[in-house]
Amino acid sequence: MSDRFIEAVQSLDLSRVPSPCHLIHRGLLEENCRILHSVQERTGAKILLALKGFAQFSEFPLIARYLSGTTASGLHEALLGHEFFPGECHVYSPAFPPADVPELVRFVDHISFNSPSQWQRFRSTVAASGRKISCGIRVNPQYAEVEHEIYNPCAAGSRLGTIRSEISGPEALEGLEGLHMHTMCEQGADVLARTIPHFEEKFAEFIPQMKWINFGGGHWITQPGYDVDLLCSTILAFRKKWGKHLQIYLEPGEAIALRTGILVCTVLDIVRNGMPIAILDTSASAHMPDTLEMPYRPEILGAGKSGEFAHTYRLAGGTCLAGDVIGDYSFPQPLVPGTRLALLDMSHYTMVKNTTFNGICLPAIASFEPATGEYRVIRRFGYADYKNKLG
């Protein structure tokens, strides 16, 4: 983790918020947004917030000062963006339910269809809306450098995007104004630079008839060490080659919220079975499912690897899932019931994926404003939230 992030988190008072709680540092969030805005200024590209990664709409007014709009994965995300985030509203889905499209065309600005057949099916609905909606198609260049197959949109047999052999010719894309590719996950500008030639090799004949190209998400633009200069030069070179009339879009989700917040949790009990096990009021399964899906071991403020410090514990969640385990950590001081912990970098792909498995309470949502020192609890969850999603 970057020194800037650690210093900011160390200054937080964990006792000022409920437990468990997602706590967003608004100063860090704004720093990320400024980096993204600088890319827009240097390249003319437009950067959209991908709501699938971060959708805490209480922070949309801040983010909207810097970004050009939102991109959604379906009707409900699109509605959230339309309601709370000024700017462009984009939507893509692997397959749109027929009932959703008449709703979407009432307010979205861009629709990316996954296949020519989806475009042909809903083309008349778009036209009947009477609104200017720019439509495109997601394509699959069949090239990616994603390490984890579960996150690889170009894996063999992927449903995400149309491969070149499934497009009969330019006439199949008649009426479409954009090409959308998403091939990356937590990667640098060098990967985009290596991917674009594969995109051009397969889809160059269609580019001249387009008004925009969307390079998708997975761009780790706010990660320390990310080569922003290379990203900008890559975008500018593409526009120089294919025409400055082409609007370029990027739609990161993680890059907006990367290293902006923590998950505050509390030790409930310590049990022993071969080693001390600290049971927390949070859950890997319900509150941070990527730790099990990827899997990965989240960092914790002040903690080290097993055996690094004097006191080693296995940290586990409070659900009945035997594998609801966060990992093994060591601490300079013993943990006791009531000890509060800060799991680092827990803003993205957490709130949007939380569940109430076992009836476990969803973490509260709070923010910290460094300019004033204010802690604001935005939302607490309870029994009604659990009950209402079940009937």
Regions found by a protein language model. Give the residues of each.
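Glycine-rich beta-strand-to-loop/alpha-helix junction loops that act as flexible
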Residues: 183-184, 213-222, 252-255
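Charged (often Lys/Glu-rich) extended helix/loop segments that serve as interaction or gating elements
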Residues: 247-391
